[in-house]
Amino acid sequence: MDPQPPPPAQGSPPHRGRGRGRGRGRGRGRGRGRGGAGAPRAPLPCPTCGRLFRFPYYLSRHRLSHSGLRPHACPLCPKAFRRPAHLSRHLRGHGPQPPLRCAACPRTFPEPAQLRRHLAQEHAGGEVELAIERVAKETAEPSWGPQDEGSEPPTTAAAGATEEEAVAAWPETWPAGEPSTLAAPTSAAEPRESESEEAEAGAAELRAELALAAGRQEEKQVLLQADWTLLCLRCREAFATKGELKAHPCLRPEGEQEGEGGPPPRPKRHQCSICLKAFARPWSLSRHRLVHSTDRPFVCPDCGLAFRLASYLRQHRRVHGPLSLLAPLPAAGKKDDKASGARNSAKGPEGGEGAECGGASEGGEGQNGGDAAPARPPAGEPRFWCPECGKGFRRRAHLRQHGVTHSGARPFQCVRCQREFKRLADLARHAQVHAGGPAPHPCPRCPRRFSRAYSLLRHQRCHRAELERAAALQALQAQAPTSPPPPPPPLKAEQEEEGLPLPLANIKEEPPSPGTPPQSPPAPPVFLSASCFDSQDHSAFEMEEEEVDSKAHLRGLGGLAS
């Protein structure tokens, strides 16, 4: 029997008085006990080795090393461990674990964390605790993986069967190692058949309760397969691209699918006079008319390309780099056509989604004499509002995409890692993790690569100063030929006539005559500081008479400055 730890010193708080421990209130009451304000916590020594610990939990965990107890045994080999974390880490060495089965649906998961997340997302509400209880009962059965539907768990022959017979009847579900006797079932008072029947009854009850709330829960619709195709789980049809999957009728919202008794489609009263294509909304016709017109009012200031919509121009300007995106969009040119002027005035920055056609805006009727179109908000204002949080959107598709955040459903699942996503775009972006290889968006100025184009644009802000310097240098180089050239230096004859001193580069030394002795190189110049002239003794600077006369002669000729 292990000796009990000594009682804490006087003035130190007991273990239950530590407050929240590692929570937010950890720094408030640290080191303050009931004995006095600011009293330090007394360390707790180990009675066996004398090691000091700050908290009783650390001391009790340390005392397991002296006791030799290993309560967490491995069910596959004779090894045992002191902590459950060590056991879970050891189980990974036996190979992949069999999947865990959900008690409410036939889905399986390789990790307990994924099963808990599935229960919280799919079977949310009051059914989560019941589902966890069913899972705990099923995982407590002999085998870790899901049993066949027709098979029943093994039972002991009699209540008084020996432990060896129970171990022999225990099925071996793992290829590596043999189950230890600690994990084998012993003779229990209640038969195992009653437990399995109770678990099945609870699972059936849970499925019945979840069926009532199936109307507000979205089922899994799309699955990313191993061959990178998108599989529709409703009709089992695979698609190669995301656009083909979105056009699939199974992914349409409720009420818009054919034959489901939803609201009737809006009549298409607005018809194009050129191709006879009809539209249900006037602004859809206005946007369609741009296909037939040659009017391209949005011109790129960098390369001169013209576009029909401002959104097309904004997407094109990414080619010219981040500096082009920082500049404002140029305004559309003024047109004499009345219809185009009405379109440009009502179009707004998005370029056509909220623009009305000229005929519908001038008159009070539609294109073919229908009823007047309802008054629409100004361009850029939200038209669709979320009933849950009141957030506004300009497009109905954005409102549908936002509704997933309130439902909590994740209808898009990756088949490789069982990870779930709210949007199809997130699933397609996640596929790059399994594809491997370099990211598709490299930075042109550094070796970094990014998986998203937006991340690359955000990263290029770091090179903004460098790009601005390069742009300024290019501007200076472009302006250099236009500046007047510097005046040429005056000629030698002009300088001699004006009496100006010639530069040293233009003075040529005459070669010495053959009979003259070689001259010594000129002495280096001597520089005197101002402190030399502050001395009272000027004898060192007295010059001889010949030297004074020569200097006076030069000064008279103008060659020496006075």
Curated annotation (Swiss-Prot):
Modified residue annotations for Omega-N-methylarginine: 92
Protein localization: Nucleus
ZnF region ranges: C2H2-type: 44-66, 72-94, 100-123, 270-292, 298-320, 384-406, 412-434, 441-463
Pfam families: zf-C2H2 (PF00096)
Biased composition (Pro residues): 1-11, 482-491, 512-525
Chain intervals with Basic residues compositional bias: 15-33
Function per UniProt: May be involved in transcriptional regulation.
Protein name: Zinc finger protein 579
Origin species: Homo sapiens (Human)
